[in-house]
A protein has these predicted regions:
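Active-site gating loops and adjacent loop-to-helix segments of metal-dependent hydrolytic enzymes
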Residues: 26-68
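Conserved small/polar residues in nucleotide/adenosyl-binding loops
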Residues: 225-232
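Divalent metal-dependent hydrolysis catalytic cores, especially in the metallo-beta-lactamase
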Residues: 10, 53-62, 81-101, 126-132, ...
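Aromatic/hydrophobic pocket-lining residues that form π-stacking "cages" and hydrophobic walls in ligand
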Residues: 26, 77, 112, 116, ...
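Short amphipathic alpha-helices and their capping/turn segments at secondary-structure boundaries
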Residues: 71-82, 223-224
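Divalent metal-binding pocket/active-site signature
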Residues: 93-221
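Divalent metal-binding segments
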Residues: 16, 55-75, 100-103
Length: 233
């Protein structure tokens, strides 16, 4: 039997838009970036911790600040999906990270949402979008993000997430945003158990009550926190 994993249809539930910048997309935005620079600054061959890896995403974000740039990146991501035979994906991004060149957070969501819908029609790949707040965001920024999820609930925005450096920032600023999400029937996920241990997963489940945990690999540190139902933990 000629078995090739590349040909299998796949579901990808954890994609960060700012971590998917390919060299092909980058040189459409800035033709002067060399392949060696791309490998050094955007891939990171020596990332020893989450903070090091996030620096690569920060470099990519510099090229995701205009309508044209965002549309290039989204179209390129769909090309990557087609190469991997992805049939359904959930792509997350933080709108407030794309407003450095004059776009509003709402405009960012509109641009990415509209381009995603167009690419879905062209590719017949089904993609939902998840809006992220970040651990280092203020309470106001977190509430702004979840309100965008609510405002676009009739579009292709399917959920709310919290990402970034869990080791450096507590959950306090984000509790109200997740309470708002639950009151408005917004599906929630939360990154935890990646840079910290199982105790971080327990704290996240208790304080944010997400429907899913993103990563959660450190749950293995304590099997007590690997219940199939987060709401029962």
């Amino acid at each position: 039997m000629d078995f090739k994993i590349e040909k299998l249809p796949k579901v990808e539930l954890h994609v960060h838009l700012d971590c998917c910048l390919s060299y092909e997309a980058l040189i459409k935005i800035d033709p002067d970036v060399s392949l060696s620079t791309f490998k050094e600054k955007f891939i990171g061959t020596t990332c020893s911790c989450l903070k090091d890896y996030i620096k690569c995403a920060d470099n990519a974000l510099e090229y995701m600040q205009s309508k044209e740039q965002l549309e290039i990146v989204v179209e390129d991501l769909f090309n990557q999906f087609k190469e991997d035979n992805i049939v359904y994906a959930e792509v997350r991004f933080a709108p407030l990270l794309h407003i450095n060149n004059g776009l509003s957070s709402r405009e960012v969501v509109e641009i990415i949402s509209n381009k995603t819908k167009l690419e879905c029609l062209k590719s017949e790949i089904d993609v939902g979008l998840i809006l992220c707040t970040l651990r280092h965001f203020t309470e106001e920024q977190s509430l702004e993000t979840v309100n965008l999820v609510h405002q676009f609930s009739n579009e292709n925005i399917v959920g709310f997430d919290i990402a970034a450096d869990e080791a450096g920032f507590p959950l306090d600023n984000h509790i109200k945003a997740f309470e708002f999400a639950h009151k408005n029937n917004i599906y929630c996920t939360a990154h935890a158990g990646e840079a910290l241990g199982a105790e971080s997963v327990k704290s996240t489940l208790k304080n944010l009550k997400p429907h899913r945990i993103g990563h959660g690999v450190r749950c293995i540190d304590c099997l007590l926190y690997t219940s199939p139902s987060p709401r029962d933990s």
